[in-house]
Amino acid sequence: FRLEDSVKLSEIEKKVEEGALSSFLKPPLYSKKQTALTFGKFDGVHIGHRKIFSTLFAKAEEYGLQSAVLSFTLDKDSFFLRERKESLALPDEHFTRLKNAGFQEVFLYSLTESLARMSPEDFVRSILHEALKVKQLVVGTDCSFGYKGEGDVALLKRLQKKYDFTLTVVEKLYTEGEDGQSVPISSSYIRKLLEE
């Protein structure tokens, strides 16, 4: 423990008022056990996310792995990219929803500048492989990560052998839009409906 790592009571009270106490209580980005993991913002935890989660839980059970999720928040202390969209849930609500979804480990982190500038392969190597010991990785088809979101499913497919994990890609779910057309279920679509 270092003095510069300490937090003032007034800062904690302010975080409680903002519904962001979990930003002080987050666990270290490290897992003692090998994991079946998914990562992403998972804003609102909708039915599309739940399809990813159920696939992950099945993989965790099949291979005897710890089920884990790495998610990110864009609170006002975060480094964020040009387009900041309002979140569907406060950080504490988000953490609770993920924990209640059934994950054994929930890692919820602010999107810092260093994380946002990390190359996609560095993210896979240092975070997924070294820190979180990922053996089974489950993502959606539109997965993006690393600097400018340059990492994608194609890159994960190329890196899975090098970093000793198996990738499972879950297809999107669709619903009928207002015009009768098929629309992918996403946090952006839900946010749009809430704005109307």
What role is predicted for each listed range?
Residues F1-E196:
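Nucleotidyltransferase catalytic core that binds NTPs
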